[in-house]
Amino acid sequence: MPYYLQDSDGELLKDKGKQKDLLEGSSSGLDKITYDPHSWLSVVNGKKYFNAIQDKLIEKYPENARLYKKNKLKCVDKLTDLDAQYNEKFKALDRREFLVVHYAYAYMARDFNLIQYPLQGLTSLESPSLKTIRKAVDFARDRKIDTVFYEYGKPPKEAQALAEEIGGKVAPLASMEFVTADQKKKKQGYLDLMEMNIQNLYESLEKGGGQ
């Protein structure tokens, strides 16, 4: 899949014919995952990435420096606000643990001093074993967890089955590994999904999602 640089209105910054493909084809199989790769799911890392992206874009397209700086400041300010606002909110809660299908939220958990309990590994390709599900049920009941998080944009079948077992409910968390048709329709970007993730986690813990 080729990628092209666009401005905030969706217009190409350079003529398409002059653009170079950043990556052709799928990126799957290029790396062997031995660590949590979901580092973008962090308000702290996100700010670093926006700064790094701005610097590289200015280096390549200095004529657009003002636009890049403006957009970077907007994004960094939003993440800073989310960080400060929700760190205060999470500090006031006794609950810290949440149950999730996909093991993708270690960085977000770190940012807000939370603990994730995943059913799957670092990829969402494999299904959890019956033994894993039984342990998750016992874990949830022991800690009075009533929310099971599924990956936003994918069927919540496994999360719903577990939620029914513990008499709970399901809620979405976005790993942002892919873009869904619904996200395109709603024009949901990185900041929107980060805010949704943090808000959903907070609401579940505030109302009884762990201890």
Language model region names:
Residues 1-211:
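Extracytoplasmic metal-acquisition and chelation regions
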